[in-house]
A protein has these predicted regions:
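Beta-loop-alpha module in the N-terminal Rossmann-like domain of NAD(P)-dependent dehydrogenases
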Residues: 7-70
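Rossmann-fold dehydrogenase core element
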Residues: 65-83, 104-108
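C-terminal helix-rich "cap/oligomerization" subdomain common to oxidoreductases
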Residues: 5, 27-32, 178, 230, ...
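Hydrophobic residues in well-ordered beta-strands that form the structural core
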Residues: 13, 53-54, 78-80, 208
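Predominantly a Rossmann-like dinucleotide-binding segment in NAD(P)-dependent oxidoreductases
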Residues: 84-157, 164
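Contiguous beta-strand/loop segments that form the cofactor/metal-binding neighborhood of enzyme cores
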Residues: 143-216, 243-254
């Protein structure tokens, strides 16, 4: 109650069930650990609530497929709070690629690493909390790749270094789709890396730093060597962009749904 009073929160619930069944609630934002998403999402859908859920949306495709079907049956929208799909810079870069100035996308390279102290009880390294590099940070890289590839990858090679708990502490991925576009990903929870994404094309390349919440990118053209800096949006407004897209998706704009 003290927290609610401090931040002027008008309604407080004594249980999750009380919130899920409240007829005045239209949308629920789920921000709990990964391993709880499926259960909470299912409960929300059955109570006719639209859902925005933090990444990773579920632990596997079977869970997600079931929930998508259930959402369609109950006429509700589910969306993943994956910043890559909602930050304005990505739509702007997509327009540049669609213009043809850079030519075909050939290769995408991704890095994301943070140094987490070995604490086997926290969510990063705890199997019971769906820990590991892929579910925590790898989903950003894969979403970036999917945004810029012409089709989803259908070939995958991977190498994993496990943490003492068995979750993936480090991972390397090599992906390719039917168009021959390739992508490489290096992830780590125990080694700091820059959050860098690069899209290499026939006539130049795009480089994006801090790509999970990017607001700026550089576009370099091979023939002239010129580099153009592109800006759009603000880092601190990332959640607002997600909410705006969620509202538009509920209103019927399917282009704002990225599942």
């Amino acid at each position: 109650m003290a927290f609610a009073e401090k931040y002027n929160i008008g309604k407080v619930y004594d249980s999750y069930d009380e919130m899920f069944t409240d007829p005045d609630v239209d949308i629920i934002y789920i921000t709990t650990p990964h391993n709880t998403h499926y259960g909470f999402m299912k409960k929300a859908i059955l109570n006719k609530k639209h859902i925005l859920v933090e990444k990773s949306i579920t632990l596997n495709s079977d869970e997600l497929g079931e929930l998508i079907a259930l959402a369609e049956e109950n006429n509700v929208v589910i969306g993943e709070a994956m910043t890559v799909y909602h930050m304005p810079i990505y739509s702007k870069l997509r327009e540049i690629l669609d213009s043809g100035k850079l030519g075909k996308v050939n290769l995408i390279t991704m890095n994301f690493g943070s140094f987490k102290e070995y604490d086997m009880n926290n969510r990063f390294f705890n199997r019971n909390l769906a820990g590991g590099a892929m579910l925590d940070i790898g989903v950003y890289a894969l979403s970036f790749i999917r945004w810029f590839m012409d089709s989803k990858p259908d070939q995958l090679l991977s190498q994993v270094k496990p943490a003492p708990t068995g979750v993936d502490e480090q991972a390397g991925l090599l992906l390719m789709n039917k168009e021959g576009q390739m992508a490489t990903v290096m992830l780590s929870l125990h080694s700091k890396q820059p959050k860098r994404g690069m899209v290499s094309c026939e006539n130049g390349y795009i480089e994006i730093m801090e790509y999970p919440r990017a607001w700026e990118a550089s576009v370099t053209y091979t023939e002239t060597g010129d580099t153009e800096v592109i800006t759009a949006g603000k880092n601190e407004d990332a959640l607002a962009y997600e909410l705006e897209d969620m509202e538009q998706a509920i209103a019927g704009d399917e282009s704002k749904m990225h599942l």
